[in-house]
Amino acid sequence: SIVLFCLLCSCARIPAKLPEQTSNSTTETSAVYTPKPDEIRAVWISCYELPDAAQGEEKFRERAEEMFNNVADMKLNTVFVHVRAFADAVYPSKLFPWSKYSCKGSDPGFDPLKVMVECAHRAGLKIHAWINPFRVSSSDNIDSLPQGSPAKKLIGTDTVIQLKNGIYFDPASTDVHALIYDGVREILDGYEVDGIHIDDYFYPTRDESIDRAEYEAYVSGGGDKGLNEWRRDSVSAFAA
């Protein structure tokens, strides 16, 4: 995923002293940024930086408005808002449990994503729903997964990968792909977002054992690509 970062200089006042000038003489110049058509000037807002939905809709809305107005004041035009960091959601979902970050793992009594879409558009910004498709948890403890997590139902199958640094969905699994696509469709059908931003869609390890059964099935079916190329193709097939 690629984001264009732009250094914006708005009305920068630059004093310049020439040799023939006296110490009391200065020259001021002004650099004014002129936006280009269709240019994306974006900022990521991670799950750790979202307003606290547990404090209620009014305070959440106030904080969201403040954040997005600040973004607009910096001459940016797009926000990538983290709506799914760990197989969760910051909106009422039929597929994923409430996020433990902004939503503290339970229904806050309102729809945070709906509020953020409204606030972003009111500030003149485009808003993309940012998801991490394969991350399930930063902990390897299965018991730490919330009730309703789709990964919890799949533990022990080839669909979920459990490592020392966390739990992940198998990037090669077509069942995983279907789940992620359904999650994206849920967002597109329910919210007037301007895009979907997919980040961190890679294999969590080089360990050859995590998808051995799937790779062997591929080879048995006549596949002739090496493991690394097959894995790259699996991710490409997902993203396509």
Label the model's feature ranges.
Residues 34-61, 128-191:
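Active-site-adjacent "subsite" loops/lids of carbohydrate-active enzymes
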Residues 41-45, 77-82, 126-130, 195-199:
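Structural recognition of the beta-strand scaffold that forms the well-ordered cores
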Residues 12-19:
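Bacterial lipoprotein signal-peptidase II cleavage site
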Residues 114, 154-240:
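Polysaccharide-binding and catalytic clefts of secreted carbohydrate-active enzymes
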Residues 67-68, 81, 85-132, 226-240:
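Aromatic-lined substrate-binding rim segments of carbohydrate-active enzymes
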Residues 71, 79, 120, 127, ...:
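Conserved, mostly hydrophobic/aromatic
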Residues 7-10:
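C-terminal motif of bacterial Sec signal peptides marking the signal peptidase cleavage site
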Residues 62-89, 190-195:
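Catalytic domains of carbohydrate-active enzymes, especially glycoside hydrolases
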